[in-house]
A protein has these predicted regions:
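Residue-level recognition of single "structural anchor" positions
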Residues: 1-308
């Protein structure tokens, strides 16, 4: 069942912290300082912060946000949960401007940084290998547009960024921002993510010809001759192209422009939604919440990436 937006966890701070702690600590509070499980008292009082505990063993104080992307945040927990749910429930994504208006933050920058921290939580700890014996992995590349303000005066189109997507027809998808479509560049990513026991399906790009020999089988379709399927529909890259269609709708319909520096996190979000497409919005939001452990993202990191 999907989460009801009228649920108390989205408007009551105590309920929000209780939900967050139940996901973060299913077996009771864990002290991040000494590692002791379920041996802490909750500090209660008018001046006490929400979710504050004191460990019986090391006597240090802690909250469930330590060691997560929420650490150090002054944003109320119920707004974090609501923002994460809205991003997980929106098929084409949620822009920072929209989130800013809906949640009533003091600044757009706060909402923008919040979105990136939530995307960081969606990042898988391990990528691949996808595919395997008797499975088909599609590999295809596309161009995602940059910002119009960054284009040269004489150019009609903004700079495009190359994205490679690998998708197991019966499983997950992973997308990457790559420098070019040369054989060496493609190989560096594909052989790490896709099992070589897989059948590799691609388009007719010459860079795939040699690479295909490293897999159990390789077939391609030539779009320049209006060929989109072969071998009775077995060879195609339609699944990967479906992924690209969803990506571009998110760019044009929601975000309008995405900078090269932050593109990888948007790719993570789109892959996450594809890989959890059979889940309800509530289940997807819970998975995103579970993924925040052991991850940190500071505003300085995002700002430095934008100016790198």
């Amino acid at each position: 069942m999907s989460i009801d937006l009228t649920d108390k966890i989205f408007n009551d701070e105590d309920a929000a912290w209780k939900h967050f702690e139940s996901v973060r600590w299913p077996d009771g509070p864990i002290c991040p300082h000494c590692g002791v499980i379920d041996s802490a008292d909750k500090i209660i009082g008018k001046t006490a912060r929400h979710g504050l505990y004191r460990c019986h063993e090391c006597v240090k104080q802690f909250t469930a946000t330590i060691g997560t992307i929420y650490e150090g945040s002054h944003i109320p927990m119920h707004k974090w949960l609501l923002a994460a749910h809205l991003m997980c429930a929106s098929k084409k994504g949620m822009s920072a401007h929209q989130l800013w208006r809906m949640l009533g933050f003091g600044s757009y920058r706060t909402a923008w940084f919040m979105c990136h921290r939530i995307r960081e939580g969606m990042t898988p700890k391990n990528v691949g290998p996808i595919g395997g014996q008797n499975r088909v992995v599609e590999a295809d590349e596309t161009l995602i547009g940059g910002k119009k303000k960054n284009r040269a005066f004489a150019k009609k189109e903004p700079k495009k960024h190359t994205v490679l997507t690998l998708v197991d027809r019966d499983g997950d998808s992973h997308s990457f921002h790559i420098a070019n479509v040369k054989a060496k560049t493609l190989r560096e990513t594909i052989v790490k993510v896709a099992s070589r026991k897989s059948y590799l399906a691609t388009d007719a790009l010459a860079s795939y010809e040699t690479l295909g020999r490293e897999f159990a089988g390789h077939g391609s379709v030539d779009h320049s001759t209006d060929e989109y399927v072969r071998l009775g529909g077995f060879v195609h890259v339609n699944t990967a192209e479906c992924r690209f269609s969803l990506m571009k709708r998110a760019v044009f319909g929601t975000h309008h422009s995405i900078s090269e520096a932050h593109l990888p996190r948007y790719l993570v979000e789109w892959d996450f939604k594809w890989n959890t497409r059979k889940m309800t919005d509530g289940e997807r939001a819970t998975i995103a919440l579970e993924g925040i452990e052991g991850k940190r993202l500071t505003y300085r990191q995002t700002n430095e990436a934008a100016h790198a």
